[in-house]
Amino acid sequence: MSFNLGKSLTKLIIASNNDGKIEEFIQLLSGIPLVVMGQPKHLEVEETGVSFAENARIKAIAVAKATGEMALADDSGLSVGSLGGAPGVFSARYANTDLERVSRLLKELEMVDDRSAFFSAALCLASSKGEVLLELDGRCDGIITTTPRGKFGFGYDPIFEVKGTGLTFSEMDSKQKRELSHRGLAVKKLIPSLKKILDS
């Protein structure tokens, strides 16, 4: 992306080692004059919070302090009503791989009629000094399908059918997913405030 502003662009570090998530943020923030990149590969931040918002805050502050750059963290996950909100904050740790996580969830819902679920995303933006600048969230409702569908996306995307669309995230192109996803909705709220911060 190239913006000729007569000055160097601000870096924004995405507090994640998940390549799929980083790429999604690069696309979501493509209209803003920023250099968006993932955190250093060696950097690991332990998610010790009990909520998405708390984990996002922990990650944003840690990555900002470690890199000396502005950092944006997202903690997101899938909550299934009939499983008491699981996997919730443990979505990424529900099993070792995306395939295993999807398989485990489908197995747990084998005999369950109520398959309603929602994705939540909590965002936290921290300054280069590690101060919290913004905290926002987004939510997308849907149901868990009985089998994986589609070839795009990552994580639970193949088994999450977005309410009112008849499509899983994995069946959507990236533009449609950006418009409807929990992360896309949260970033939409973030952008006006982020622009003000960059202009100040």
UniProtKB/Swiss-Prot annotation:
Alphabetical list of CDD domains matching this protein: HAM1
GO cellular component: cytosol
Amino-acid positions noted as binding Mg(2+) in the UniProt annotation, renumbered to this chain: E46, D75
UniProt keyword Magnesium, yes or no: yes
Record: residues binding substrate: S16, N17, N18, D19, G20, K21, S76, F154, G155, Y156, D157, K177, H182, R183
Key words, A-Z: Hydrolase, Magnesium, Metal-binding, Nucleotide metabolism, Nucleotide-binding
Catalytically driven reaction(s): XTP + H2O = XMP + diphosphate + H(+); dITP + H2O = dIMP + diphosphate + H(+); ITP + H2O = IMP + diphosphate + H(+)
Assigned EC number: 3.6.1.66
Pfam families xrefs: Ham1p_like
Catalytic residue list: D75
Top-rank EC class of the record's enzyme: hydrolase
InterPro entries (alphabetical): dITP/XTP_pyrophosphatase (IPR020922), ITPase-like_fam (IPR029001), RdgB/HAM1 (IPR002637)
GO biological process: nucleotide metabolic process; purine nucleoside triphosphate catabolic process
GO molecular function terms attached to this record: dITP diphosphatase activity; ITP diphosphatase activity; metal ion binding; nucleotide binding; ribonucleoside triphosphate phosphatase activity; XTP diphosphatase activity
Cofactor binding: number and manner: Binds 1 Mg(2+) ion per subunit.
Cofactor (UniProt): Mg(2+)
Subunit structure: Homodimer.
Described function: Pyrophosphatase that catalyzes the hydrolysis of nucleoside triphosphates to their monophosphate derivatives, with a high preference for the non-canonical purine nucleotides XTP (xanthosine triphosphate), dITP (deoxyinosine triphosphate) and ITP. Seems to function as a house-cleaning enzyme that removes non-canonical purine nucleotides from the nucleotide pool, thus preventing their incorporation into DNA/RNA and avoiding chromosomal lesions.
Similarity section: Belongs to the HAM1 NTPase family.
NCBIfam families named among the record's database cross-references: RdgB/HAM1 family non-canonical purine NTP pyrophosphatase (TIGR00042)
UniProt-recorded name of the protein: dITP/XTP pyrophosphatase
UniProt source species: Prochlorococcus marinus (strain SARG / CCMP1375 / SS120)
Highest classification ranks of the organism: Bacteria, Bacillati, Cyanobacteriota, Cyanophyceae, Synechococcales
